[in-house]
């Protein structure tokens, strides 16, 4: 039996309205809205405005991170949402971003991170193996 420690969604959003992803203030509000909507826990954040267009930003979460990098001149945004614990929060954060940006096309990759064995008896396998060596 195995369990997954985290879920990572990488999304390429195409056909996004220029104005929604050009200014750092809007990009920051987008990610902070996703964090709130998904009930995630923000630790810190950093955002940057590019000249002449585009923005980038990351929010460090207790659960991991959420980030964006934009090319408004191409109507493109690269989104990264990775959380540990409940998968539903990862999907909820991405849902908020997609509903807000309304892209014409989405290319999404989903990866389960940290697939580890589960020992239902609660026995520490590592200690047992060390004792046998």
Swiss-Prot record:
Provide the cofactor note recorded for this chain's UniProt entry: Binds 1 pyruvoyl group covalently per subunit.
Per the record, its GO cellular-component terms are:
cytosol
Query: Which residues are modified to Pyruvic acid (Ser)?
Result: 64
Keyword Signal (UniProt): no
Query: In what pathway does it function?
Result: Amine and polyamine biosynthesis; S-adenosylmethioninamine biosynthesis; S-adenosylmethioninamine from S-adenosyl-L-methionine: step 1/1
Q: What positions are marked as the site Cleavage (non-hydrolytic)?
A: 63-64
Post-translation changes: Is synthesized initially as an inactive proenzyme. Formation of the active enzyme involves a self-maturation process in which the active site pyruvoyl group is generated from an internal serine residue via an autocatalytic post-translational modification. Two non-identical subunits are generated from the proenzyme in this reaction, and the pyruvate is formed at the N-terminus of the alpha chain, which is derived from the carboxyl end of the proenzyme.
**Single GO MF descriptor:** adenosylmethionine decarboxylase activity
- In this protein, the active site sits at 64 (schiff-base intermediate with substrate), 69 (proton acceptor), 84 (proton donor)
Q: What class of enzyme is it?
A: lyase
Q: Which SUPFAM superfamilies match?
A: S-adenosylmethionine decarboxylase
Query: What's the family?
Result: Belongs to the prokaryotic AdoMetDC family. Type 1 subfamily.
Matching entries from NCBIfam families are given as:
SAM_DCase_Bsu
State whether it acts alone or in a complex, and with which partners, per the record.
Heterotetramer of two alpha and two beta chains arranged as a dimer of alpha/beta heterodimers.
This molecule's function is given as:
Catalyzes the decarboxylation of S-adenosylmethionine to S-adenosylmethioninamine (dcAdoMet), the propylamine donor required for the synthesis of the polyamines spermine and spermidine from the diamine putrescine.
Query: What PANTHER family does the database record attribute to this sequence?
Result: S-ADENOSYLMETHIONINE DECARBOXYLASE PROENZYME
| Name recorded for this polypeptide | S-adenosylmethionine decarboxylase proenzyme
């Amino acid at each position: 039996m195995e369990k997954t420690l985290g879920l990572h969604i990488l999304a390429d959003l195409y056909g996004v309205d220029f104005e929604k992803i050009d200014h750092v203030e809007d990009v920051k509000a987008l990610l902070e809205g996703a964090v709130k909507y998904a009930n995630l826990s923000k630790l810190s954040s950093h955002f940057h405005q590019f000249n002449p267009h585009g923005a980038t930003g990351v929010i460090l979460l207790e659960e991991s991170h959420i980030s964006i990098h934009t090319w408004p001149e191409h109507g493109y945004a690269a989104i990264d949402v990775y959380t540990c614990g409940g998968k539903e929060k990862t999907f909820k954060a991405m849902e908020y971003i997609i509903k807000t940006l309304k892209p014409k096309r989405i290319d999404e990759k989903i990866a389960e991170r940290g697939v580890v064995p589960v020992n239902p008896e609660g026995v520490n396998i590592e200690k047992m193996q060390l004792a046998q060596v």
